[in-house]
Amino acid sequence: MTKRKIVSIVAAVLLACVVAGGSFYYYASHHVVKMIPGHVYQYSSNLKGKDNSRSMYVAFSENSDKAIVTQDKSEALKAGQSEEQFEKVYKAQSKTASWKYKASGNKVTLGKVENKQLSQWQYNSVLAFGKHFSSSNFTYQIAKAGQGQVKQKMTFKQID
């Protein structure tokens, strides 16, 4: 083989790797929109390589922008059984606070309305594949408490 042929083959292989990697990244960064409706996720954080032992659960409605956020795994799983069960659990939870969600591109936003005050958490740089998605950071705006950004990995694992 000539030197020119070897360089051409190496360049073609590198180009194929870049295209494949870019395609996977695009898929993973835009797939969350399709994967969360109608499912239940356990989410927890990871800071400096250490997992947080506290977990929360979120159930996403299949047909609306409603969400249920709870520390009770059985309540979240019950909400994930059917849209009818979801509405029952949502109605009970919304007596104190109601949750909504929006997923677009590589962002997921959870909003909580409590006492007519809105608090929001926006998970940025979301990568989704398999039965989980993760975010490398999130921003928050808490009613009457302030706002900020947290550079902490959040992992959402599908449990239903």
Name each model-derived stretch.
Residues 9-23:
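Hydrophobic membrane-insertion alpha-helices, especially the h-region
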Residues 31-56:
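Tryptophan-anchored aromatic micro-motifs
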Residues 1, 27, 157-160:
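Intrinsically disordered, low-complexity repeat and linker tracts
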Residues 50-70:
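Post-signal-peptide N-terminal segment of Sec-exported extracytoplasmic proteins
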Residues 148-160:
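Short, low-complexity, Pro/Ser/Thr/Gly-rich segments in the mature regions of secreted, periplasmic
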Residues 1-5, 13:
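Positively charged n-region of N-terminal signal peptides that target proteins for export
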Residues 48-52, 70-144:
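Contiguous, well-ordered beta-strand patches that form the walls/edges
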Residues 20-33:
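Membrane-interface motif at the C-terminal end of an N-terminal transmembrane signal
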